[in-house]
Amino acid sequence: MATKFPKFSQGLASDPTTRRIWFGIATAHDFETHDGMTEEKLYQKIFASHFGQLAIIFLWTSGNLFHVAWQGNFEKWGEDPLHVRPIAHTIWDPHFGQPAVEAFTRGGASAPVNIAYSGVYQWWYTIGMRTNVDLYNGSLFLLFVAGLFLFAGWLHLQPTFAPAVSWFKNAESRLNHHLSGLFGVSSLAWTGHLVHVAIPASRGETVRWDNFLTTLPHPAGLAPFFTGQWAVYAQNPDTAGHIFGTSEGAGTAILTFLGGFHPQTQSLWLTDMAHHHLAIAVVFIIAGHQYRTNFGIGHSMKEILEAHTAPSGRLGAGHTGLFDTVNNSLHFQLGLALASVGVLCSLTAQHMYSMPPYAFLAQDFTTQAALYSHHQYIAGFIMCGAFAHGAIFFIRDYDPEANKGNVLARMLEHKEAIISHLSWVSLFLGFHTLGLYVHNDVMQAFGTPEKQILIEPVFAQWIQAAQGKALYGFDILLSGDNAATAAGNSIYLPGWLAGINSSTNSLFLPIGPGDFLVHHAIALGLHTTTLILVKGALDARGSKLMPDKKDFGYSFPCDGPGRGGTCDISAWDAFYLAVFWELNTVSWTVFYFHWKHLALWQGNSAQFDESSTYIMGWLRDYLWLNSSQLINGYNPFGMNSLSVWAWMFLFGHLIYATGFMFLISWRGYWQELIETLVWAHERTPLANFVKWNDKPVALSIVQARLVGLTHFAVGFVLTYAAFVIASTSGKFG
């Protein structure tokens, strides 16, 4: 008999029911639980899968480059970035009628095309690419690299090349290599690219492999570097009248500290960015020599952590035992990595619009809105994953003996205090924020809008003023002729002060009562999500009710017969509930960003300022007003280029609604449904030609919840993606 799926679990493979298939899929990547898994094999499998992941990423980016080179209008866009719409790829669809063909033939194309809202055109243009051949070369190079990584992944699974567990647990060597190599040398290489290729391209000079070694990036060459006169590289920067991509108004500086934005492209100065990456390279290459490995010099991570014990004795054993706890737990390491990447992803969203790094990105409003939404949603999912693996760490890897009295154990001991404080903050934020919104709604409804409670965010405005924003008049507190004032003014970069006080960018936007309220609504969402996730992780091993549920595992569900009252210790349920809150929080955040910017881009900030102080304002003047094109996207009188987004908006709602079918039903319902279907199948002559051996059983509680949550999340994201792209591109083209 052929071996049945899944091969990695003898127990599941011999399960006579359809559970075999679903549980097999669910645990396919849970290598730890597979038959015959050793620690060594576990580390090697994960290591090899990293190469596969990187290969997929390179293949994907290669595909982006290839399709734009083949079907896009990159060269034409480069001639007039503000007026030519960038093409992602052509659309070939046999369902397109003549109106659709006409509606989607744009951007100077001869057939229907998709417009690119990913910012790749701006990125490639900024880093010095100018022709389709450049894009093809990049595509082929990345394709080659993807192949290389697939080979490397396979190679490291072969006995001769498979690293030992000791290699994976050599934390100091890994830190040194990642700091110096991954961050340091790659930043240095990027500085090199910016200085040798991108900056010359921005000044109208093409540097490729044929002239790379003969073209000096700076007229003085390396002489200033070796003589210590580094300031020479900052002299003669591009002027305010510089036309990007030409020599008009260009300077010769390569490493500057101008601050602010290039007046024409509205993006950060390339020479500032080169300087930034060089500084990071220096810092990280030095940092990568900190830890003790081969030569017996440098820090030992373990010694540092063991020494971190507060002298007063009031903080217990401090960081004792943490090195081994972290180093021996893949889930702990993954949790830390996910938390870091999540924060980084959210920071990317914030900085991509406030300080755009790519030329002409600031003037492409739809792309800005799309990039912000994209990075915030991804950040939310990744951060939830950090807590999930934190909970799995407590269940599978946490050893109370090895962590006696240290910060980890102490955190578990006073988890009641942590959870109750988070609970109190969430309740406070929720009642007060909603109370203000609802009060304002009532005042609007009763015709006395002047009785709204409108609170100016004075502390936030003060922080903005401290960064140099003059709008609020806080400088009245300064003594103008004081020497300290004069000295203080010089710490701001000249371009920064101009940038922060300009009304044409998104840097430190003017804020008022509407911002104050939505800020606290987002704070409510963040604290509630954190409360659910933190409680799920801290109670993962047990609570007062059930002291230790280690053997129940992570995906233990908290309802069903005989499991009454165990909901407070199901880490899976906590994660599941938190994702709903996380999605809500991210949506409030992107609603705020999008509406604030629509008002800014349209030159009418009053609409946001006046309508954002009450809930009806958000529903009517943001959601409804901006979805009107989508609700009327295609009708008996025809269609337009927004019709596809209108259809996606509808389809997203449908997927989202399907989620509730799985969320508001219990396991017995599915079993009944399946048995009814089987009964009908067996009594239908034609259907009896198809036979299966597995006995059909219903989804488990956790599975039904997962299916429901997945539909909810996918529908949610699809709906908002269609909304944000259609409502923005419908206004600004």
From Swiss-Prot:
Catalysed reaction, written as an equation: reduced [plastocyanin] + hnu + oxidized [2Fe-2S]-[ferredoxin] = oxidized [plastocyanin] + reduced [2Fe-2S]-[ferredoxin]
E.C. code: 1.97.1.12
Chain residues that bind [4Fe-4S] cluster: 558, 567
Cell compartments where the protein resides: Plastid, Chloroplast thylakoid membrane
Domain of life, per lineage: Eukaryota
GO cellular component, one term: photosystem I
Keywords (A to Z) from UniProt: 4Fe-4S, Chlorophyll, Chloroplast, Chromophore, Electron transport, Iron, Iron-sulfur, Magnesium, Membrane, Metal-binding, Oxidoreductase, Photosynthesis, Photosystem I, Plastid, Thylakoid, Transmembrane, Transmembrane helix, Transport
Molecular function as annotated in GO: 4 iron, 4 sulfur cluster binding; chlorophyll binding; electron transfer activity; magnesium ion binding; oxidoreductase activity
Positions of chlorophyll a B1 binding: 653
Free-text comment on the cofactor: P700 is a chlorophyll a/chlorophyll a' dimer, A0 is one or more chlorophyll a, A1 is one or both phylloquinones and FX is a shared 4Fe-4S iron-sulfur center.
Keyword Membrane appears in the UniProt entry: yes
Annotated chlorophyll a B3 binding sites: 661, 669
Function per UniProt: PsaA and PsaB bind P700, the primary electron donor of photosystem I (PSI), as well as the electron acceptors A0, A1 and FX. PSI is a plastocyanin/cytochrome c6-ferredoxin oxidoreductase, converting photonic excitation into a charge separation, which transfers an electron from the donor P700 chlorophyll pair to the spectroscopically characterized acceptors A0, A1, FX, FA and FB in turn. Oxidized P700 is reduced on the lumenal side of the thylakoid membrane by plastocyanin or cytochrome c6.
HAMAP family to which the protein is assigned, alphabetical: PSI_PsaB
Oligomer and partners: The PsaA/B heterodimer binds the P700 chlorophyll special pair and subsequent electron acceptors. PSI consists of a core antenna complex that captures photons, and an electron transfer chain that converts photonic excitation into a charge separation. The eukaryotic PSI reaction center is composed of at least 11 subunits.
Name of the protein: Photosystem I P700 chlorophyll a apoprotein A2
